[in-house]
Amino acid sequence: NETTAASIADSIQILYNYKDRRDTGLQYTFLEFGAMGCISCRKMERVMEDIRTTYGKRVKVRFMNVSKQETQEWTKYFGIAAIPTQIILDNNGHEIFRHTGFISAEDLGTVFK
């Protein structure tokens, strides 16, 4: 649905475009697509916390529970086919990194260097 895709694209610009918002200091958004019943997704909870702790002033971390109705449009927009999937957006809200499966905080951190 083009209307849905446009509204998600607009939401991304409103929520995650930091380029013109100097007050935030944020440079990246880390979207973690997963579900509560998924073992690898649960392992990613620790990674999300590590990223928050290490890069909190520069990286906004957001968990997107694919089993919730309110994230279905986001899941479709990003074409999520398997979980967990990590997507990193730059400060313009553009996707710069994607990974499916478990990834360590150390490996993920290389994106933020």
PLM feature spans:
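Typically the conserved alpha-helix immediately C-terminal to a functionally engaged Cys/Sec
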Residues: 41-55
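Extracytoplasmic
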Residues: 25-28, 56-59, 81-83
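Thiol-based oxidoreductase modules, predominantly thioredoxin-like and allied folds used
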Residues: 33, 56-72
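Non-catalytic, surface beta->alpha helical segment in thiol-disulfide oxidoreductase systems
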Residues: 82, 87-113
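Short active-site neighborhood of thiol/selenol oxidoreductases, capturing the structured segment around
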Residues: 22-36
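A short glycine-leucine-enriched loop at secondary-structure breakpoints
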Residues: 76-80
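N-terminal targeting signals for export/organelle localization
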Residues: 1-10
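The canonical Cys-X-X-Cys-His
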Residues: 38-42, 86
